Amino acid sequence: SQISQTNTIDYCSNVIYENGVLNMILTEEGYMTFSGNTPIYHYYLKDHQGNNRIIMNQNGTTAEQVNHYYPFGGLFEEGLATSNQNYKYNSKELDRMHGLDWYDYIARMMDSSLGRFIALDPLAEEYYSISPYLCCANNPINAIDPDGKSTWVINNSDGTYRVVGGLLEDNDPNIYVYTIEDGQLIRGESIGVTT
């Protein structure tokens, strides 16, 4: 049997084209689709880990999609799927091609049914005490993996900041408190050292 692809998807930063036609513009709060030249806004309602739980219409009056997840992002219910947007668990794109249902974490793909990445961690030498295929250090309730390379620990007390492991690329073992201001991640005080 042969596999034939009928759609071409091109990504230019946060702009997505399908078959050469503008399809979607991603924003921090959601995304825009178009009816002719008129933009239609869709907004994400996220949980403490950045998972897109509900997609609301531009008026905020109608839920277009509701997502319920298993701990590693597998969908156990996808209700009200009038929206076909694929940015779900940890706000990562769910690639459903060929029925694989893998999340695109930029550096590598994650299989949510296994809770494992399908490729070796590019920073595996820095995390020798854990498997190089684990997602979120095997703790998806208290941690997220923003790019498939490093794990961030979330402070659940009020949801306003995240505790982020030291940047191993520059050999800094400190753990910092980060805040988000005007959409930018700002590094604050050091609260400890990684071991």
Question: Which residues make up each language-model segment?
Answer:
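Short polybasic amphipathic segments
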Residues: 1, 14-18, 30-33, 151-154, ...
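Short turn/helix-capping motifs enriched in Asx and small/polar residues
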Residues: 59-74, 98, 106-108, 112-194
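A motif-centric feature for acidic-aromatic and gly/ser/thr-rich catalytic loops and repeats
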Residues: 7-9, 13, 17-23, 28, ...
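Surface-exposed charge patches in extracellular/virion surface proteins
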Residues: 2-5, 187
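ABC ATPase nucleotide-binding domain signature region
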Residues: 4-7, 111
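Short hydrophobic/aromatic-rich beta-strand segments that constitute the beta-sheet cores
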Residues: 1-2, 18, 55, 117-119
